Amino acid sequence: MAGYGLPNEKHLSVVLQRNLVSEGHNIEVVNGSVSGSTSAGGLNIAEWTLSEPDIDLMILCLGANDMLRGINPKETKSNLEEIIKIAKDKNIKVIIAGMIAPTSYGLNYKKTFDKIFSDLAKIYELQLVPFLLEGVAQKPEFNLSDGM
């Protein structure tokens, strides 16, 4: 997650790096995200981004902007699947972070979108974070003024 509107020290990648190092891990967390990016945008840069040497793990956090734009969940799933394949071809482990669509998009859209992440985790034997924004979503103190 790019951390749009957050000070740098509160970006997910920075907090993750700080926490892992404080636990004694010798690790570097690199933020490869782009604010506003969709799964298609992520797919466009995946080969290049994942060509860096010594990448052991990727946390895949794409799909939320697809949902906000009403992109067909089948397209989102296909793009995420291609990103996973690129990572796997490079022997990069993948953790996939899920998102949840609101009911305002309709129950069919919500059902189809919400299943993307667990389906891909099962197919590719990935570790799944069911809802990345658990404990953050719908809490005004953790969101932008527009509620996002």
Range-by-range predicted roles:
Residues 1-37, 45-54:
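Serine-esterase "nucleophile elbow" of acetyl-processing enzymes
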Residues 15-18, 22, 41-148:
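Alpha-helical cap/lid subdomain in secreted, periplasmic
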